[in-house]
Curated annotation (Swiss-Prot):
PROSITE patterns: THF_DHG_CYH_1, THF_DHG_CYH_2. It comes from the Bacteria. NADP(+) binds at residues 165-167, 190, 231. This is Bifunctional protein FolD. GO terms for cellular component: cytosol. Catalyzes the oxidation of 5,10-methylenetetrahydrofolate to 5,10-methenyltetrahydrofolate and then the hydrolysis of 5,10-methenyltetrahydrofolate to 10-formyltetrahydrofolate. GO terms for biological process: L-histidine biosynthetic process; methionine biosynthetic process; purine nucleotide biosynthetic process; tetrahydrofolate interconversion.
Amino acid sequence: MPAQLLDGNALSKKLRAEIAARAAIVTAKGVRPGLAVIVVGDNPASQVYVRNKVKACEDVGFHSVLEPYPAELGEEELLARIATLNADPAIHGILVQLPLPEHIAAERVLEAIAPEKDVDGFHVSNAGALMVGKPEFIPCTPYGCMKLLESIEYPIRGARAVIVGASNIVGKPMAMLLLQAGATVTICNSKTRDLAHHTKDADILVVATGKPKMVSGDMIKNGAVVIDVGINRLPDGKLCGDVDFDAAKYVAGWITPVPGGVGPMTITMLLMNTLEAAEKASKP
């Protein structure tokens, strides 16, 4: 029997309705949630992601500012613009779309964003707060993954969770969230020996490597929840994840589709973080 789908589009629709309702309340108090999105260069994937984020803001009643810059933009110019946005009371969240051109140090840029406006949750102070279980903002993709697990009331406490991919954006914060929810967590990376030995033991398997279909069906435990964070374009133009969906769906109990799984949830949790930043700003 095929796995049940963890439908990110359906859950996003429900959550965005709640976000829009809360945004209307805070806007009525004179604080309209505002998000500034900065994109440097003309990376086609970045352009698509940015357009989707701006449209999502408009759909829930947020004020959004899209700031596109040429790839030649200097690092100091970008830092100066971030400083201006940090001081702008109409902006509650600042997002710098990654990747940045090679001449710009992404770490320096991300740490220039005021922590209270760091709605991506990448600032070192927010990462540290997450580590000790007191997050200001949870990184959007792991946050969305946790919401998907919550939506099926999955019993995380005591479960064996395996994360393939150890990035600061997904793997590490995902591990912290699952650990805090009571799971026993293993993080695998490119140096991990016998990856299948670990993945086949996972009740919850989260894959975020950027490698198309690298996790095959025979690497998955029967009945596992499989969350595929990857989105890759194949030579024929089709999109696929980091998991071989067609094989995995006959082994897993639950699985996220690609597209339509984690992707829409990432944007939805960006909206949630921006809303919460605005709600905090509205309090006297």
